[in-house]
Amino acid sequence: VDVVTPIEGHPARCGLSGGHPWRWPAGLLTVLVPVTLPLSAQQPLTPPSHFQKLAHTYSIVAYDSATGDLGIAVQSKFPNVGGIVPWAVSGVGAVATQSLGNTAYGEEGLSLISQGATAEEALRIIMRTDTMLQDRQVGMVDARGNSASFTGTRTFDWAGGRVGCGGKPTVPEAFTMETAEHGTLCEVVGGKGQVIVGRGFAAQANIMVSDQTVLNLARTFQLTRGNLADRLMAALKAGQAGGGDRRGMQSAALLVVRKHGGYLGANDRFIDIRVYDAPDPIAELERLLALHKLHFFPSEERDLLPITPAIVRQLEPILLREPAGQPEKWLKAPEGKANDVFLAALRDFMYWENYDVRVRMDGKIDRIVLEDILRKRSR
């Protein structure tokens, strides 16, 4: 494959030679971040015979150099996008395969990266033998921070992508640089038939209202502070605010991998949340992320509160009603006092309610846990 690095607004040349069918053809349309080609220059939305198998999607794949986390956030007008588009392995890379998505880009791409290929090299190797290449959209990032994105010429408007350049551009005319409130943003912009290469993240989309969705994905991810999951979630919400999929919303997913980050350290699935079908899948994804944090993330120091008599009075009637609270052990305790018996009953209750990672032994309670307990018991 010979792909010329794009200049914004000018389509690149792409020539293919050879090729054979994929071993695992899939039927989803992968979304790449939009490019700034005028709508008049892109093909009209004329559904092909395989249109219903396409994942009308926008996604972002990214690497967090501070933690080593890798992740993907995606939304689509297609059910169960989380079972098709996102692929990731800790210490290796992350892949989003959309727009008649081919799972081989996930499986083989990550295998190639694990053997030493960069995100770009892995992408180009797989592209060589893809006989339906121009129906694909793919974003890749490796654990060294390299990123790459490709949008096929037969993807539906609006379609394109953006990747972060993460430093001084080597081909200045291929980059867009803008100064924002938080510093300088640097992105590589690409359209149909183009492979774009950069650093840190790759955002891509197809069948969008306009290029604003991909622009929002890229800019919001760069400007948002916090952990990778929060940055990906913010980017996904901003992408939808930019117009999103022309056909609407249906499913969404968030995948973040970290070495030993899964349950009891048994795997790398630090966060793996999927919304199969919902009227507002992004809002549901955000709700489930908050729930996941509550039950699987430890407390933050800023959220810890001393258990005051006022808090004891709030929790006392709840513990009296709950078997796990063991009321017979502390009914005779001094009223309003968070003594050892009360604290032991509270810990038993918290374990019973799956707040395990936020249980305290120091006379404090997590503010978020307290709010959750009171909210549930007030229903």
Task: List the predicted regions and their residue ranges.
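Secreted/luminal cysteine- and crosslink-motif detector
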Residues: 15, 23-25, 166, 187
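Long, contiguous interaction/recruitment modules in multidomain scaffold/adaptor proteins
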Residues: 261-279, 283-287
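N-terminal secretory signal peptides that target proteins for export/translocation
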Residues: 1-22
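Intrinsically disordered and other compositionally biased segments
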Residues: 9-11, 34, 40, 358
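Bacterial N-terminal signal peptides
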Residues: 25-38
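C-terminal substrate-recognition/cap domain of FAD-linked oxidoreductases
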Residues: 248-251, 265
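Alpha/propeptide regions of enzymes that mature by internal proteolysis
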Residues: 42-247, 254-256, 277-303, 330, ...
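Short acidic, glycine/serine/threonine-rich helix-capping segments at coil-helix boundaries
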Residues: 303-378
